């Protein structure tokens, strides 16, 4: 067996339905598998799909400790290499712990050794390099910030996602829907075995005829009604909003984004994902299977909002704040009523509260990027545009900047988290107040899901329009942006509008009708 990892790639047959192909190749039953997809929000056509079919290492961060669990022979070699690289932080087998920084200077705190260092070493120093690999896929929890900032202690929630969890890909399927091309890539210390495994997968892909691509068998739900329960009833949520508005009146904050959780039975998370991608195609769609503290989970969603995107080739950072929401104009049968839709758009565009909230968050995005960008490189590339989805429309903007040459994408993520559209402003004070009223971790909700490539690229989305599924129960979280002029009941209604696409997908997958108790 070779001591140096070997990368092998293979062009394979293109399939339009990447999610069905992912299921055909065993992705819905394999541990540590993941699928990321992207669709054009205007045409709804697929852009790209990226699947991890086999992982070599699972990387889990809890507090200041990171556990790197090798899953294959090549993974064991990678972790051994990592242990040599980060030996001073190696506190137990496959485990690394990092002390909290006591630096006062902001740049010193940002660049001090931290749990981010494990991801950085795996991204840039895994011992192999190819156009497709290394590839890390996974996500950061909203609560990851607590490992760098002091926040009020709160309890665990039904969303038990760790501070971060990624997998280091061993076999990847990369599909370009625009060019109608597909490629398998893999890495292994045993080149012959790897080549044979990829050839076997290639034959399975050839055998996945279009007529059989949709043969995924769903798990039925026992009952005609899917009962959805809000953890915080409307009356209590209105009270929380009024409490938070007092902090706005007092000048503590300008805006804040409280959230609540809708829970529902979800016997088949992948079937729900298929329904969500069909009814609500989005720029960032994801289905992830993971394991944390011995318990398996699934995380799926169709997010409209980029978190932080970094393109290494031109060192451009991009934030995509979304704030301002209206329901789509629908006829009773669910079809689009163009006149009502335009009326709702006009109402949103002329709503002083929505414009104030959105403008505030664009300024916040500019301030976030200022911390890590080349001076005078920031610009608002798009302002107050409208993106339409199946159930809602949003006001959106795009802010760009050039990353400081001394920093990388992980530094930028750490400096910018969490996005203001999920916290409020000022961000740290808003998050302190949110913990005071919510009293639970948010888990994956409001965090990020995406990938890191060995060339330095990073792309991830904010985890919204999503469900965290564990033990057959889905937690669907949604928030509302609260400013001085907010109407508490309108904000409570907005959380359901935002959650509805996911809840409806779960109901469709179960062949049931929704009943929401709020």
Curated annotation (Swiss-Prot):
Transmembrane segments: none annotated. Chorismate binds at residues 324-325, 445, 465, 479-481. GO terms for biological process: L-tryptophan biosynthetic process. It catalyses: chorismate + L-glutamine = anthranilate + pyruvate + L-glutamate + H(+). Pathway: Amino-acid biosynthesis; L-tryptophan biosynthesis; L-tryptophan from chorismate: step 1/5. Keywords: Amino-acid biosynthesis, Aromatic amino acid biosynthesis, Lyase, Magnesium, Metal-binding, Tryptophan biosynthesis. The keyword Disulfide bond does not apply. One of its GO terms (molecular function) is metal ion binding. Its EC number is 4.1.3.27. Its cofactor is Mg(2+). Pfam families: Anth_synt_I_N, Chorismate_bind. L-tryptophan binds at residues 38, 283-285. The keyword Metal-binding applies. Binds 1 Mg(2+) ion per subunit. Mg(2+) binds at residues 357, 494. Feedback inhibited by tryptophan. Heterotetramer consisting of two non-identical subunits: a beta subunit (TrpG) and a large alpha subunit (TrpE). Belongs to the anthranilate synthase component I family. NCBIfam families: PRK13564.1, trpE_proteo. Part of a heterotetrameric complex that catalyzes the two-step biosynthesis of anthranilate, an intermediate in the biosynthesis of L-tryptophan. In the first step, the glutamine-binding beta subunit (TrpG) of anthranilate synthase (AS) provides the glutamine amidotransferase activity which generates ammonia as a substrate that, along with chorismate, is used in the second step, catalyzed by the large alpha subunit of AS (TrpE) to produce anthranilate. In the absence of TrpG, TrpE can synthesize anthranilate directly from chorismate and high concentrations of ammonia. This is Anthranilate synthase component 1.
């Amino acid at each position: 067996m070779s001591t140096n990892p070997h990368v092998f790639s293979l062009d394979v047959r293109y399939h339009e339905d990447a999610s069905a192909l992912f299921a055909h190749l065993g992705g819905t039953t394999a541990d540590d598998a993941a699928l990321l997809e992207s669709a054009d929000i205007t045409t709804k056509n697929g852009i790209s799909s990226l699947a991890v079919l086999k992982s070599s290492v699972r990387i889990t961060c809890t507090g200041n400790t990171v556990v790197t669990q090798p899953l294959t022979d090549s993974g064991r070699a990678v972790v051994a290499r990592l242990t040599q690289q980060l030996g001073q932080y190696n506190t137990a087998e496959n485990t690394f712990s990092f002390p909290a920084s006591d630096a006062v200077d902001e740049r010193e705190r940002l660049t001090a050794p931290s749990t981010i260092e494990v991801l950085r070493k795996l991204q840039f120093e895994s011992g192999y390099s190819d156009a497709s690999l290394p590839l890390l896929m996974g996500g950061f929890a909203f609560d990851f910030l607590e490992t760098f900032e002091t926040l009020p202690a709160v309890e665990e929630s039904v969303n038990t996602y760790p501070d971060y969890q990624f997998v280091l890909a061993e076999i990847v399927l990369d599909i370009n829907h625009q060019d109608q091309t597909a490629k398998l890539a893999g890495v292994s210390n045993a080149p012959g075995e790897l080549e044979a495994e990829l050839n076997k997968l290639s034959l399975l892909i050839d055998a996945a005829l279009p007529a059989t691509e949709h043969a995924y068998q769903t798990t039925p739900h026992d009952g005609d009604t899917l009962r959805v329960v809000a953890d915080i009833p409307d009356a209590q949520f209105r009270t929380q909003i009024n409490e938070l508005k007092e902090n706005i009146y007092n000048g503590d904050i300008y805006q804040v984004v409280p959230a609540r959780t809708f829970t529902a039975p979800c016997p088949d998370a992948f079937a729900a994902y298929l329904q969500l991608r069909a009814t609500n195609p989005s720029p960032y769609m994801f289905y992830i299977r993971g394991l944390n503290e011995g318990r398996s989970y699934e995380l799926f969603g169709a997010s409209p909002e980029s978190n932080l995107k970094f393109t290494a080739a031109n060192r451009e950072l991009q934030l995509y704040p979304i704030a301002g929401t209206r329901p789509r104009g629908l006829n009773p049968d669910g079809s689009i009523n163009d006149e009502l839709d335009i009326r709702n758009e006009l109402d949103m565009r002329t709503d002083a509260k929505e414009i104030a909230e959105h403008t505030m968050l664009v300024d916040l995005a500019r301030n976030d990027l200022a911390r890590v960008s080349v001076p005078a490189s920031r610009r608002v590339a798009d302002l107050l545009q409208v993106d339409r989805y199946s159930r809602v429309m949003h006001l959106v903007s795009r802010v760009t900047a050039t990353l400081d040459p001394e920093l990388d994408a992980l530094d930028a993520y750490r400096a910018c988290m969490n996005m203001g559209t999920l916290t409020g402003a000022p961000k740290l004070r808003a998050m302190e107040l949110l913990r005071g009223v919510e009293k639970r971790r948010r888990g994956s909700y409001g965090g990020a899901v995406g990938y890191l490539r060995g060339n330095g690229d990073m792309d991830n989305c904010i985890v919204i329009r999503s469900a965290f599924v564990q033990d057959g129960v889905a937690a669907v979280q949604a928030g509302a942006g609260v400013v001085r002029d907010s109407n508490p009941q309108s904000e409570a209604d907005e959380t359901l509008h935002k959650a509805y696409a996911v809840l409806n997908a779960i109901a469709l997958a179960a062949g049931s009708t929704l009943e929401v108790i709020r």
